[in-house]
């Protein structure tokens, strides 16, 4: 929802959800920040996104920004180890997000469904959905 023109399917899906059912991981917040850091330093889009990440996203999610706890870190450790043993290493951020969703019994909403395949976490992509 940080795009100037969000995907209409995503916007419609978000609108249908009760706010209290939507959560975000601190890992996702870090990924958003990293993405902004990669933009040209003086660009107006970077300044706009920085403002949204620091002000609007915390407001939207308020007390629903989930930390990485010891239990989540331990879940990630198992997920990551299993994937490495299977010869399918995963991105650390994706693993932490999956572990957070598993710990809280949540569904990961992402465009990158394949990144979460085989992790035992429920995944949904509203991109292209109606």
Where are the regions a protein language model picked out?
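Short, well-structured N-terminal submotif of metal-dependent ribonuclease cores
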Residues: 1-28, 37-55, 71, 118, ...
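Residue-level signal for short amphipathic helical patches enriched in basic/charged
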Residues: 5, 60, 111
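Short, conserved clusters of charged catalytic residues that mark active-site
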Residues: 5-9, 92, 108
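Active-site neighborhoods of divalent-metal-dependent phosphate/nucleic-acid chemistry enzymes
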Residues: 21, 34-40, 59-107
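Histidine- and aromatic-rich ligand-binding microenvironments
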Residues: 25, 90-91, 112, 130
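Acidic, PIN/NYN-like endoribonuclease modules and their adjacent C-terminal/linker elements
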Residues: 98-130
């Amino acid at each position: 929802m940080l795009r100037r023109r969000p995907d209409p399917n995503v916007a419609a899906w978000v609108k249908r959800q009760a706010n209290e059912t939507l959560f975000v991981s601190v890992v996702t917040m870090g990924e958003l920040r990293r993405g902004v850091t990669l933009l040209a330093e003086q660009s107006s889009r970077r300044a706009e996104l920085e403002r949204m990440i620091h002000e609007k996203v915390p407001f939207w999610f308020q007390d629903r920004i989930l930390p990485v706890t010891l239990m989540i870190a331990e879940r990630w450790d198992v997920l990551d180890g299993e994937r490495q043993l299977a010869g399918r290493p995963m991105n650390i951020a994706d693993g932490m997000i999956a572990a957070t969703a598993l710990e809280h019994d949540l569904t990961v909403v992402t465009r990158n469904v394949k990144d979460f395949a085989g992790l035992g976490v429920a995944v949904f992509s509203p991109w292209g959905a109606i």
